[in-house]
């Protein structure tokens, strides 16, 4: 939940940060890009380090670093210092996401792992719903710095909980030596696999279609829909409700229907929502609730697709699942950083172009899945 909190909580504070530090809106948005780029880069290392040193140790150290970075963000008096500490947050925030998936796969397999991953998605979906609403209240009642103080306190609670209750799922005899040549060899194997690109692309492009609206929220909600900082829940509650319901559906269906059929159901929601989003904004002006309703159904579809495809990706290299999880998360987050830093600023001034951008991401994801499915079926026939 740390990742969503560190992204979504401070979005309502963008105008306040801009006024406080006397910078442009683009410079404030680059704090999100800096975080995402650092997050993506470190994704490549969290899993590899956890494969060598154990899952629990990496999570505890990364939480401590994130807590320090949150204090730095709260104390930043220039945009440059805020960029630096957001980078430090990004370097540490992803450990729970990557290592957590590896822990699940260490202990469980098959439908049980798929169900647990869906359950984790449901629990984690609470954060993006609460975060922007909480951020809006905080920035209205106090100031934007209090948001980062909240993140510091929240992280302290996580450190205590993990230190006391989180077990080590990777015993020493199953760990791999942390060696640069070994890492290069492992990364080369993963990044030379066409199936990895196709399956990671499936998840990444689906996510990008939703994250486009997350990155554009300060403009989409305040300028196009006329909402205040306290109105961010109008977008994030439907999105997160969709993630929760989609993950619940995926959890219930895991093992009951073939994975490919579950993905097909997911794309029925994804494609339908994206098409309706484009059609509505071409014909009508943006308005609540119609402008955010497609995001609800889009999120349902995304959560139907992600668990099964993620497990397929992890099983491409069973002996180095930590590294595979890192590479997949890096791909997803790197695309998210491009969306936040390049695509969202270009498209966010027009609700129609935002909808078209989301539709384009769905088409890319469907193409990746189609090619991945063909490759998988071809492998099974040989």
Feature names for model-found ranges:
Residues 85-126:
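Cytoplasmic helix-loop-helix junction between adjacent transmembrane helices
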Residues 20-22, 54, 75-81, 92, ...:
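Helix-breaking motifs and short loop linkers at transmembrane-helix boundaries and internal kinks
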Residues 41-79:
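Conserved MFS/SLC helix-loop-helix module at the cytosolic interface between two early adjacent transmembrane helices
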Residues 311-348, 357-358:
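A late C-terminal transmembrane helix in Major Facilitator Superfamily
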Residues 65, 69-72, 80-88, 289-295:
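Paired small-residue
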Residues 81, 110, 118-164:
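Helix-loop-helix hairpin linking two adjacent transmembrane segments in secondary transporters
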Residues 169-200:
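Juxtamembrane intracellular "pre-TM" segments in multi-pass secondary transporters
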